[in-house]
Amino acid sequence: NGHALLACQRQAEHLVDDNDTITLEPLGNMKPIKDLVVDFTPFWDKVNKVKPYLEPKEAPPEKERHQSPKEFLLIDDASTCIMCGACHSDCDVLEVDENFLGPAALAKAQRFVQDSRDGKTLERVKDLSKPGGIWDCTHCGECVERCPKPARPFDRIKEIMTVALEQGVTNNNGARHALSFAKSVKSSGRLNENIIPVESVGFFNFKGLFDLLPVGLRMFFKGKNPPILHKSIDEVEDVKRIYMELDE
């Protein structure tokens, strides 16, 4: 019925529409081979790109590597992924950009980015911050809706974003946008829509700023530019207070 579901988790009687019909289609964002069979090769290629294996900090010990319960909880949810492809099928970004790694691959990446035994965290988040990576996610949450397990890919993507910022991997539009967004809310309790686009591309990224010019001019002539001076908002200090409490 237009969404990816696991047949083993659904009762047919709950899926029939008003005409007592269930629509079956191949998984989305994958090339059909025959009937409902699709080619999973691009899916696995994306998973392999994130290096879904441990790259340890040190030589293998004589016994197993130890992890505390707290350390394991960071990767527990991602470990529940069964690679069913449901999130990949319904991803809106993959529908328009085949270079996007996709929610399944990025959820698998978080499994190793935050693994306390892995020694390549910085290298991983640098690779994942490139075009097609974490910052190309549109935050629609469709992957979470489709995921049949606690993996919740979008939550895993957000965790990689947090690690990337903590590691200082901020020289990209996505990270700059997130930092500008947070700075604006922290300082004024609202979004400064005039400065955020500029800070997102970078003050000294002249090509990026030039690319913004046509959009800015169209907005200006259509009267769509945000005002320079905003009207005051009642209790805006509460927004700043909430932000500060969450930021602690």
Roles of regions detected by a PLM:
Residues 1-28:
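Hydrophobic/aromatic-rich structural module bridging two neighboring secondary-structure elements via a short loop
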Residues 22-30, 34-80, 85-248:
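Ferredoxin-type iron-sulfur electron-transfer modules in oxidoreductases and energy-metabolism complexes
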